[in-house]
């Protein structure tokens, strides 16, 4: 199922990359303007897509804030509302440092995340492992796994940035998409596998990686929290920068 999700994601993001490539590396809404929207209704359709896209990002960001707040609750035992405010203040720094600095920070954040996953994986296998139980086959479980993998590895706006960053080099764009989604899928398998193998007791927390950390030791719980925090902050900053980019191209 992970392989199917990988193939579907690659095909969909190849289409997005081609749309952006054919329209000079512009954002998604502008690509729709160049390929789909014409005539008197062009602006109405463009604004409609932007509004829907913006709402989707805002809903995602709200969930992101709740996830980030949960980390502070686990770390400091603070009230959830206060944790939400604290996370929002930290994440809001992106507004002040600018999109270029955000891009540079994301590069190093990804390196940190890869290092944490490597350490957590080693730590998992240094402790007694759970036996993987085989659940009864059901289509709903299969579809849930597919949806999770597709959601976790989706990167439609990152593909557009690849088109711009590689100056329209089609060969390198294709290679980046294949390799990028391959790495993302491997990460999903590693993180999911270590959580299932190393977590003691039933999975009860929303942030399963932190529960894995608790099962390994205090140091691992801290690392898992840092991993979750960095991952959520990266997602938050990406959501903001891409929404801001769409505002710019629409002259808002």
Predicted features and spans:
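Hydrophobic alpha-helical transmembrane segments of multi-pass membrane proteins
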Residues: 3, 48-59, 89-90, 143-150, ...
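Central hydrophobic cores of alpha-helical transmembrane segments in multi-pass inner-membrane proteins
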Residues: 6-15, 91-96
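Transmembrane-helix boundary/entry motifs in multi-pass membrane transporters
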Residues: 15-59, 73-80, 209-225
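Membrane-water interface regions at transmembrane-helix termini and the short interhelical loops
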Residues: 67-74, 88-109, 165
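Helix-loop-helix junctions that connect adjacent transmembrane segments
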Residues: 81-86, 104-211
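Hydrophobic core segments of alpha-helical transmembrane domains in multi-pass membrane transport
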Residues: 90-95, 114-121, 228
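Oxyanion-binding "anion nests"
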Residues: 206-244
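Single conserved hydrophobic/aromatic residue that forms the stacking wall/gate
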Residues: 242-245, 249-252
């Amino acid at each position: 199922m992970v392989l199917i999700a990988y193939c579907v994601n690659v095909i969909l993001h190849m289409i997005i990359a081609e749309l952006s490539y054919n329209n000079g590396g512009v954002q998604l809404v502008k690509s729709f303007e160049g390929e789909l929207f014409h005539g008197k209704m062009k602006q109405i359709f463009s604004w409609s897509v932007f509004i829907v896209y913006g709402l989707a990002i805002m809903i995602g960001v709200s969930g992101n804030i709740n996830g980030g707040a949960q980390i502070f609750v686990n770390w400091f035992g603070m009230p959830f509302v206060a944790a939400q405010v604290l996370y929002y203040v930290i994440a809001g720094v992106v507004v002040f440092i600018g999109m270029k600095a955000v891009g540079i920070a994301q590069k190093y954040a990804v390196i940190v995340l890869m290092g944490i996953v490597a350490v957590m994986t080693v730590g998992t296998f240094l402790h007694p492992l759970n036996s993987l139980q085989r659940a009864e086959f059901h289509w709903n479980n299969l579809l849930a796994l597919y949806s999770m993998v597709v959601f976790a590895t989706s990167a439609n706006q990152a593909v557009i940035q690849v088109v711009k960053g590689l100056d329209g080099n089609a060969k390198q764009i294709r290679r980046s998409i294949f390799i990028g989604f391959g790495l993302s899928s491997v990460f999903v398998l590693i993180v999911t596998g270590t959580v299932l193998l190393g977590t003691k007791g039933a999975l009860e927390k929303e942030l399963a990686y932190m529960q894995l950390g608790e099962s390994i030791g205090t140091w691992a719980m801290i690392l898992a929290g840092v991993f979750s925090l960095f991952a959520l902050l990266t997602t938050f900053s990406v959501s903001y920068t891409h929404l801001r980019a769409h505002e710019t191209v629409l002259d808002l």
